[in-house]
Amino acid sequence: MTIAIPEMIDAVFDVSGDRVPVNYPFALWKELTRLVPELAGDASIGVLPLRTTGSATGMLLPKRAKLVIRLPVSLAPHVASLSGQPLDVGHPLRLANGRLREILAYSTIHAQLVAGADDEVVFAESLSACLADLGITASLICGRKSSLVDGDRRIHGFSLVIHDLKPEDSLLLLYAGLGSHRKYGCGIFVPYKVISDLY
């Protein structure tokens, strides 16, 4: 199966702030589309999960936290306006100047949460079938089960490592992702260097 996807790129912004709520992805997407309405109409756009540390009062941001938006190259000029902007995701954040980062192929990639069934066997079988439909041969390792919850909205799934990828298949998955809810950080892959770190 061949699918047409646009060439993608990562727009990277340093983020200043102390913490974010556990359900911050919903408010973050709302803020981003408020500031850059062009983002709202393209389902291929994804927002990578922020690197955080859990605490009793929310999720703490490290000093070098970064917001990464994966989007078609054609839309990259629109997000330049995010530089220096404040964001309200339940706690205040501010973005520094952004830069563009090329997406490179890696044989092993990882997604923090891929949306799907809440049963691991069903989840793995569904993703294996999806990869087969794409003509991709690779190995899967399902990790931790987790959920995103915001009121009545609930997104379930597992973290996922895909390894033994050919370069062209890696780029396809890095560009297109797997599953739904990319705007909330789901199904977006990044390089993963040590498989044992999953456990």
Predicted regions and their residues:
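RNA-interacting cores
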Residues: 1-199
